[in-house]
Amino acid sequence: MGCLGNSKTEDQRNEEKAQREANKKIEKQLQKDKQVYRATHRLLLLGAGESGKSTIVKQMRILHVNGFNGEGGEEDPQAARSNSDGEKATKVQDIKNNLKEAIETIVAAMSNLVPPVELANPENQFRVDYILSVMNVPNFDFPPEFYEHAKALWEDEGVRACYERSNEYQLIDCAQYFLDKIDVIKQADYVPSDQDLLRCRVLTSGIFETKFQVDKVNFHMFDVGGQRDERRKWIQCFNDVTAIIFVVASSSYNMVIREDNQTNRLQEALNLFKSIWNNRWLRTISVILFLNKQDLLAEKVLAGKSKIEDYFPEFARYTTPEDATPEPGEDPRVTRAKYFIRDEFLRISTASGDGRHYCYPHFTCAVDTENIRRVFNDCRDIIQRMHLRQYELL
């Protein structure tokens, strides 16, 4: 019996030893995971709808992952290239849908605007009728006549005049870009370029995480939907983020939001920024402000058709600050406009600033890869300092 007792004790000892070793392994892994987690910079992308958040994420993939492939983790270049081509093929449908939505929206708006817009060539009316007849066709297969009608209409001066008034209705930003490329997109062997994929508009619903590495530093970027009904989901992302990147469509000063067709888009962005800046859960998280769509802002300002002071009367009294640094060759009117918009946001951050978090503004053009590369490089030092502060190492 004694031997049996000893044998049982031996089994118990072995089991306890194995358990201790297992616990050690688990503890070691937990410590390792904790170190990786603490070493990761988590960036939360926020902003109103259609400000360019998803385009910023696409640029991170181009710059720091493997472009437009599935996961971005392939070490085999051939596999990465294969995945990239596969994803581009699936995006063709999204691009065609953007093209269809663009021409449909413009021709449908012609009769609804006040005053309405007439076709320059009345013989194109049958083309308008065709476009409107296929507006709600599910799984549309894009026959040759669609491209023929769309191209002829896009060349009609009346349709162009309606496009010029697109701030009076809801039109996707990429409309002109894809309508100008009808002859390319209609080809059976069409493969989208990176620029096509950057321009492609697909509504973001839910929360998407993109992981990438820059100089051996891990970044996790969270992109959430910008429309009002998506915002309640944001709180899930707020836990332990290093910084918020708040994206603004600077060119939206003369537009209204899709949700109610009344609220000014830039005012909506200012209101949202204020609510985030003053949120009690975010009082220690600094904000990197991307004043986006600078290319479209410059176009609008120089066209002179929609004046900022008609929407923001205080612009009439605004003077460009002395410390402004315009881009080479930039028109002074553009410089004044972009700094006015910047200062509207800084007014919010300085009014309620308590020294616990800061706002760092940058002028961006999300579809310009080199611009985003330069801006993100400028931001990395700021993000690093935020990260050190987050874990009280600074």
From Swiss-Prot:
Gene3D superfamilies hit by this protein: GI Alpha 1, domain 2-like, P-loop containing nucleotide triphosphate hydrolases
Transmembrane segments: none
Subcellular location: Cell membrane
Enzymatic reactions: GTP + H2O = GDP + phosphate + H(+)
EC number: 3.6.5.-
Binding site for GTP: 47-55, 197-204, 223-227, 292-295, 366
Matches recorded under PROSITE patterns: G_ALPHA
Protein's name in the database: Guanine nucleotide-binding protein G(s) subunit alpha isoforms short
Species this chain originates from: Rattus norvegicus
